[in-house]
């Protein structure tokens, strides 16, 4: 069942509004994973439509072929490595962060071979990876650092976040070449210079805000899930303006994974309600989509723009989810 409404709170115009509910055909289709206690944390999708995911609990990299429903598991070379984030590079290579052993891993999709790469000592607890110009960037939540790894030279460089215990988490590319990071332990966002690695912190006006994941749209606007306060937030780097929308589930809904759909809507998860939310940037309206299996938490999602699909890692339920937008 899907309902629609809108509540917006701007840091410049503190006004609330309510819009009547409306129906929608969107649903979440689920794929059961082969292990009962599989724990999919992050998904990624390649240009060929194949979905990859990390099974953090069992230390597997999973492959799902949507055309056949076939699922293939690849155990990580180091047992109990705790794979967390995952990304498919332009060359097809599948990169992931091995959280428990302070390494990066690369899976060759043609052979299934996985190679691990050790990170510096101050890169303890790597979390979210992305690829920019062939370089793998990553956040290190426990070490309060972030870094980059060059696959050609196998050299890594790590920087410390200025604010202590900032817990750098979500990491995304922006159209202008910069990289944005959610500083989950603070009420701050971070902008990383994609060439120099220098980080500039931006403070969210609400001191209790805790951004967990974020995305950047085609205009450079930053959208983030405020996990602590139950809001969807936006930041305009050009004007410095922040704006917020209270999530349908309210202050305790715990917004988590977030993505931009091919049609421009912002999709995010309410971790404590088992609900996906679709936000229309033009109208400010929100739609709620109930995830079928109770206890599902979407820590991250992946967008297949070519096929108009959003893939969800349904942590806690041993499932992968799909939303068809067509």
Residue ranges and their predicted role:
Residues 297-326:
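Blade-level signature of beta-propeller repeat domains, shared across WD40, Kelch, NHL, RCC1
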Residues 23-37:
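A short helix->beta-strand "capping" segment at the edge of beta-propeller domains
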Residues 51-57, 94-100, 137-142, 179-185, ...:
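Conserved beta-strand positions in repeat-built beta-propeller and related beta-rich domains
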Residues 60-63, 102-106, 144-148, 187-191, ...:
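A short loop-to-beta-strand structural motif that recurs across blades of beta-propeller domains
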Residues 29-32, 72-76, 115-119, 157-161, ...:
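Beta-propeller fold detector
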Residues 36-48, 79-91, 95, 120-133, ...:
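Beta-rich, blade/repeat-based domains predominating
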Residues 65-69, 108-112, 150-154, 193-197, ...:
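Short loop/turn segments that connect beta-strands within beta-propeller blades
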Residues 2-13:
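Bacterial N-terminal signal peptides that target proteins for export
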């Amino acid at each position: 069942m899907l309902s629609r409404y809108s509540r917006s709170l701007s840091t410049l115009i503190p006004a609330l509004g309510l819009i009547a509910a409306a129906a929608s055909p969107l649903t979440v289709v689920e794929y059961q994973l082969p292990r009962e206690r599989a724990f999919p944390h992050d998904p990624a999708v390649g240009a060929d439509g194949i979905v990859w995911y990390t099974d953090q609990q069992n230390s597997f990299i999973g492959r799902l072929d949507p055309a056949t429903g076939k699922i293939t598991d690849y155990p990580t070379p180091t047992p109990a490595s705790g794979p967390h984030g995952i990304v498919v590079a332009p060359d097809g290579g599948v990169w992931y962060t091995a959280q428990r052993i302070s390494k990066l891993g690369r899976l060759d999709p043609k052979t299934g071979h996985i190679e691990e790469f050790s990170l510096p000592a101050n890169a303890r607890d790597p979390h979210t990876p992305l690829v920019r110009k062939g370089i793998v960037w990553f956040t290190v939540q426990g070490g309060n650092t972030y870094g980059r790894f060059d696959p050609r030279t196998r050299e890594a460089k790590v920087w410390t976040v200025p604010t202590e215990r900032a817990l750098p988490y979500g990491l995304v590319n922006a159209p202008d070449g910069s990289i944005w990071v959610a500083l989950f332990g603070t009420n701050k966002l971070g902008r990383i210079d994609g060439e120099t690695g220098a980080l500039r912190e931006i403070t969210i006006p609400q001191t209790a805000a805790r951004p967990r994941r974020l995305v950047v749209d085609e205009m450079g606007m930053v959208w983030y899930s405020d996990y602590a306060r139950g809001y969807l937030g936006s930041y305009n780097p050009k004007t410095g303006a922040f704006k917020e929308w209270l999530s349908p589930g309210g202050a305790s809904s715990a917004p988590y994974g977030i993505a931009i759909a091919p049609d421009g809507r912002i999709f995010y998860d309410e971790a404590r309600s088992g609900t996906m939310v679709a936000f229309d940037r033009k109208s400010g309206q929100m739609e709620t989509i109930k995830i079928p299996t109770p206890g599902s938490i979407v820590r991250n999602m992946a967008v297949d723009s070519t096929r108009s699909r959003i893939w969800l890692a349904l942590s806690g339920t041993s499932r992968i989810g799909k939303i068809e937008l067509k």
